[in-house]
């Protein structure tokens, strides 16, 4: 490892630990893992863990495993397994040949559970789940021993084998570790190792009738895979003594160590998998990849580039204490990434027709437009200009306030890449609604500059009516209105304006020809991405993130 990579690796306390372990000789190589449970789609919080675990392996020349913690078949589906693999790859990481499943180790875990029984460190408990919960005690009161705690090992082994064989119904018995019912850490009060669950497993089918708990499977899976640094979020800090107890009391092949970091919390966002599942099942969103969802699939469908997520995770860093990050930090990272790469296009979301009265009827011309102002390699495109165009409704005001510089009666403005125009007449319907504008243009200003040097204070985008392409545009906002939504009452805090669907938008023809997977900037509007709902003759765009609205700031300041 070079000095430069060493410096890069020392950005956070976990990388400092890894660097120290290598320097001291505790480990000769580094192995990390990302171990999702396949009971839902990955979200922003997972992105932080993915970047950390794969990033550590990359920084230190090690490897990172992708392991599915598939120990609860009642909630796990192949759909989630497939989606997780897609999302990790999309984020930019590759596990190579190191794809594993906790179910790969079911036989070994069963054998180790038998070992604990023979050692007098595990027993079969016939109490109900509620009886076990009530006997566990509280933070201030010790728990009570189960009446089955002192069962002979032979009887426990027999019952455990019969549990595996499927002789008993769900919930009839569990296997518990025999540790200390008076332990200050409640996780050490004889935790459950196995429960009976008659359910079809996505990989093992109906072979098993018992399944290991997360706590029992996790550390031992780490050991089997020779994980050196088992990195997880802070809610597992109280589980570390149990993680260590299993490793200390089993003949495991290696000794991993668990380290915890702060989980990701973001304003206007809930990352609870329970909440996300209820949002989908309750019909509050249109699926796991709804662009309002904080899932990686949702962010991808919204048009967020993977590099923006990686940069966001890098900026928030790795801390030991939980905190909440403003969602604006994510938006900033998205804008930065898209500003570098997105081609510029013109799109009118709320069209207002403009007739240029002194432009020759039946005539049109091609103008040259720049695809990216800071990236000459993207080249230029040709756009057509004619007598009738569309502009944004909000770019015209009949009686403008002092600091409004866009089009109004008698005012001259610049049309992007085209000409100066001046509004001469406002055409309205009987209700007083503006139907169209009658304007004139200055032929000498072709390209957007006046030969006499006169200046205008506004440049507006437009689309030629003759070749404009209709489109639907979906404007997405925060899914939750409140900055710190309450997971317990999330439904009451949903934002009823989290999506606005605009039909009848008009966009330039290049947008129909662009690659479907390419992000674009609608000039003066924001960054957009073609949605998978698009079809021949039907363009649909999702707003990824908006641009800064300077007029909104001025209006707010003056109100």
From Swiss-Prot:
The keyword Transport does not apply. The keyword Aminoacyl-tRNA synthetase applies. L-glutamine binds at residues 69, 214. It catalyses: tRNA(Gln) + L-glutamine + ATP = L-glutaminyl-tRNA(Gln) + AMP + diphosphate. It is found in: Cytoplasm. It is an enzyme of class 6 (ligase). This is Glutamine--tRNA ligase. It comes from Nitrobacter winogradskyi (strain ATCC 25391 / DSM 10237 / CIP 104748 / NCIMB 11846 / Nb-255). The lineage of its organism: Bacteria, Pseudomonadati, Pseudomonadota, Alphaproteobacteria, Hyphomicrobiales.
């Amino acid at each position: 490892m070079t000095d430069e990579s060493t410096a890069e690796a020392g950005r956070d306390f976990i990388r400092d630990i890894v660097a120290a372990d290598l320097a001291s000789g505790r480990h000769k190589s580094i192995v990390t893992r990302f171990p999702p449970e396949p009971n839902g789609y990955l979200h922003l919080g997972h992105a932080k863990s993915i970047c950390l675990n794969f990033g550590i392996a990359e920084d230190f020349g090690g490897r990172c495993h992708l392991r599915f913690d598939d120990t609860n078949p009642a909630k796990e589906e192949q759909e989630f397994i497939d989606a997780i693999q897609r999302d990790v790859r999309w984020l930019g990481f590759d596990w190579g040949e190191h794809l594993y499943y906790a179910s790969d180790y079911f036989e070994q875990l069963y054998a180790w559970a038998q070992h604990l029984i023979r050692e007098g460190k595990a027993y079969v408990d016939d109490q109900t789940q509620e009886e076990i919960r009530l006997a566990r005690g509280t933070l201030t009161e010790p728990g009570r021993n189960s009446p089955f705690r002192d069962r002979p090992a032979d009887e426990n082994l027999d019952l455990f084998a019969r549990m595996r064989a499927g002789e008993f119904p769900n919930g009839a018995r569990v296997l518990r570790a025999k540790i200390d019912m008076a332990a200050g850490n409640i996780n050490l009060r004889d935790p459950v190792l196995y429960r009976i669950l008659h359910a079809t497993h996505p990989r093992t089918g109906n072979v098993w009738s018992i399944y290991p708990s997360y706590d029992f499977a996790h550390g031992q899976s780490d050991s089997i895979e020779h994980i050196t640094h088992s990195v997880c979020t802070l809610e597992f800090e109280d589980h570390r003594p149990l993680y260590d107890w299993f490793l200390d009391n089993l003949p495991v092949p290696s000794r991993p160590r668990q380290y915890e970091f702060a989980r990701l919390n973001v304003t206007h966002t809930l990352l609870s998998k329970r909440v996300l599942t209820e949002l989908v099942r309750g019909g509050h969103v249109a699926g796991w990849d709804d662009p309002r969802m904080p899932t990686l699939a949702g962010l991808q469908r919204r048009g967020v580039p993977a590099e923006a997520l990686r940069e966001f995770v890098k900026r928030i860093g790795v801390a030991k204490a939980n905190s909440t990050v403003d969602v604006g930090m994510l938006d900033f990272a998205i804008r930065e990434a898209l500003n570098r790469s997105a081609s510029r296009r013109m799109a009118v979301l709320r069209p207002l027709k403009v007739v240029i009265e002194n432009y020759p009827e039946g005539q049109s011309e091609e103008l040259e437009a720049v695809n990216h102002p800071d990236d000459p390699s993207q080249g230029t495109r040709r756009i057509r200009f004619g007598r009738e165009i569309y502009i944004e409704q909000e770019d015209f005001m009949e009686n403008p306030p002092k600091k409004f510089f866009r089009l109004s009666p008698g005012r001259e403005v610049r049309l992007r890449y085209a000409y100066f125009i001046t509004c001469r007449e406002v055409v309205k319907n009987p209700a007083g609604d503006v139907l169209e504008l009658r304007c004139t243009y200055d032929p000498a200003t072709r390209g957007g500059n006046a030969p006499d040097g006169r200046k205008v204070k506004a440049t507006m985008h437009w689309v030629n009516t003759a070749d404009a392409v209709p489109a639907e545009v979906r404007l997405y906002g925060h899914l939750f209105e409140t900055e710190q939504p309450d997971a317990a009452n999330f439904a009451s805090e949903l934002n009823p304006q989290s999506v606005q669907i605009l039909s009848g938008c008009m966009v330039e023809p290049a947008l129909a020809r662009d690659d479907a997977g390419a992000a674009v900037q609608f000039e003066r509007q924001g960054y957009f991405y073609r949605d998978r709902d698009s079809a021949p003759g039907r363009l649909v765009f999702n707003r990824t993130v908006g641009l800064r609205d300077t007029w909104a700031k001025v209006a707010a300041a003056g109100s």
